[in-house]
Amino acid sequence: MANRPLDILNNALDTPVIVRLKGAREFRGELKGYDIHMNLVLDNAEELREGEVVSKFGSVVIRGDNVVYVSP
């Protein structure tokens, strides 16, 4: 049986991920948690623009309805 999306997120816990949001925003950070709505918690988060870091954050919570994809 194929992995379900939440199974893939579970396997990506405590590893670096890139999260693409609506409006072409991207964040990179260590995935610390998620829920069934795909709300995400990232540590050491950075906002990327055209592959370059434009802002650094500590921990961030990303609302799941803004997520386009999560790349482990």
UniProtKB/Swiss-Prot annotation:
Which keywords are on file for this protein?
Ribonucleoprotein
Asked if Ribonucleoprotein is a keyword of the record, the answer is: yes
Asked whether the UniProt record includes Ribonucleoprotein among its keywords, one would answer yes
Gene3D superfamilies found in the cross-reference section: 2.30.30.100
Q: Which residues belong to the signal peptide in this entry?
A: none
PANTHER family with a match to the protein in the record: SMALL NUCLEAR RIBONUCLEOPROTEIN, U6 SNRNA-ASSOCIATED SM-LIKE PROTEIN LSM7
Pfam assignment, any one? LSM
A molecular function (GO) held by this record is:
RNA binding
- HAMAP family per UniProt: Lsm_RuxX (MF_00257)
**Origin superkingdom:** Archaea
Q: Which residues form the Sm domain?
A: 4-72
Q: Name one GO cellular component term.
A: ribonucleoprotein complex
Q: Which NCBIfam families match?
A: PRK00737.1 (NF001963)
- Official protein name in the record: Putative snRNP Sm-like protein
Which CDD domains does the UniProt entry name for this protein? archaeal_Sm1
Query: Which family is this protein grouped under?
Result: Belongs to the snRNP Sm proteins family.
